[in-house]
Amino acid sequence: MKCPYCSSPDSRVINSRPSDDGASIRRRRECLTCTRRFTTYERAQLEPLMVVKRSGVREAFNPDKLLRGLALASEKRPVEEAALRTFAYSFEDEVQGGEIPTEEIGRRAMTFLRPLDDVAYIRFASVYRDFDSLERFIEEIRGLKGHEDEAPKSDPA
């Protein structure tokens, strides 16, 4: 593994352990040239999941891109980064190869965010659904509010 600090190709593994619920292996390495330490992750390469964009262009699924979108929507909100990371990195394993339209990725991300935080959900929805007016925001917020009103309420008696 090439050292990210000095680009030396020589390193040794100090520690290995399962990560992401066994979906990957986390390795601590030490460069034999500069002696700095770094972490790498190893995961099985399955058939790549291809994302079909609205324009029709296909590209390989990138969990980091999904994670960035979720993190941006959840910025300064009480949403655990670990939950976002788990969702983004397990997404490809759930779908398992083939093709998926960006609309489906967005829909699943919104389904994931909704119970976690309303503000993060609205932020993500505003980009995913391409809100073009204040009315669209209000409509979505009313939909959230209506969903809360339908939930059963506990009887204090």
Swiss-Prot record:
Cofactor binding note from Swiss-Prot or TrEMBL: Binds 1 zinc ion.
Known cofactor(s): Zn(2+)
Pfam families linked to this entry: ATP-cone (PF03477), Zn_ribbon_NrdR (PF22811)
GO MF annotation terms: ATP binding; double-stranded DNA binding; zinc ion binding
Composition skew (Polar residues), residue ranges: 8-17
A Gene Ontology biological process term: negative regulation of DNA-templated transcription
UniProt key word Transcription regulation: yes
Domain ATP-cone: 49-136
Domain of life: Bacteria
NCBIfam families associated with the record: transcriptional regulator NrdR (TIGR00244)
Task performed by this protein: Negatively regulates transcription of bacterial ribonucleotide reductase nrd genes and operons by binding to NrdR-boxes.
PANTHER family: TRANSCRIPTIONAL REPRESSOR NRDR (PTHR30455:SF2)
Full protein name: Transcriptional repressor NrdR
Gene: nrdR
